[in-house]
Regions:
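Mid-domain alpha/beta scaffold segments of enzyme catalytic cores
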Residues: 1-257
């Protein structure tokens, strides 16, 4: 069993065949968490999760790059998470949320921080973990998390980690998991993968983006998360089964699946 802990089958790239993609993944024992980036994609993630008895879950949240063009309405997101008992066990995290200073996004970092802190409060209120997006903003993010972690006892994962081992260690010391995906084929993360405890690693695709080259496909899919697991096993010098079993259990533990 494998879990793609960060997928976007709820995005437009899958609008014509998301059911086929999901059934293909479930048929190969690959579960998934579809992650929202705005209210509409969050709603879509929940609606998709509703259609499956098991193996398909949702995360809801406002991505930092949208902090300027969409107002975060806490009550609206809360209602989305709690609308009916059949939904509440499908929404397993608040995300993806965080900070992004790439290109011009840093020009509204203040608004990003305000939205981020509001979503931390929502996660605490709903007793849900968070899925964090961080790009070129580790110092700012770690500072915010250290302040709020003491107050809120936040738990979660740093999605698509691209930082140094020193930065990874700071997140690990705060109790966070490290999310590893196809970015490993573009960035050298061998030191992070070698040194991070397997018990604190989650695997993901970020599909439809960051397709592993082995997949020989333009569009990434949850089923390709197996390539990430195989390369983690190779880098750590352990067997694939250990990686799949441990990261599966890690996801169960963090997201209470």
């Amino acid at each position: 069993m494998l879990i793609d802990t960060h997928a976007h089958v709820n995005f437009k790239a899958f609008e014509n065949d998301f059911d086929e993609v999901i059934k293909r993944s479930l048929g190969e024992d690959v579960w998934m968490i579809n992650v929202g980036s705005k209210y509409e994609t969050s709603k879509k993630a929940v609606e998709i999760a509703q259609n499956y008895n098991n193996g398909v879950f949702a995360a809801i949240g406002l991505h930092p790059i949208h902090a300027q063009d969409e107002e975060f309405d806490k009550e609206r997101y809360k209602k989305l998470a709690l609308s009916g008992s059949e939904w509440s066990d499908k929404v397993v995290a608040i995300g993806e949320i965080g900070l992004d200073k790439f290109k011009d996004y840093g020009s509204f970092l203040k608004e990003q921080k305000e939205v981020f802190l509001k979503q931390l409060d929502l996660a605490k209120e709903l007793n849900l973990p968070i899925i964090i997006h961080c790009r070129m903003a580790h110092e700012d993010l770690i500072k915010e998390l250290r302040i709020k972690n003491y107050e809120l006892r936040i738990r979660g994962v740093i999605h698509c980690f691209t930082g140094t081992w020193e930065e990874a260690k700071k997140y690990l010391d705060l109790g966070f998991y490290i999310g590893i995906n196809g970015i490993i084929y573009k960035r050298d993360l061998k030191e992070v993968i070698k040194k991070a405890p397997l018990e604190k690693i989650l695997i993901e695709t970020d599909c439809p983006y960051l397709t592993p080259p082995q997949a020989e496909s333009e569009r990434n899919e949850p089923i390709f998360v197996r390539y990430i697991a195989k390369d983690i096993a190779r880098i750590k010098g352990i067997d694939f089964k250990t990686v799949s079993q441990t990261t599966f259990q890690n996801a169960i533990d963090l997201f209470n699946l």
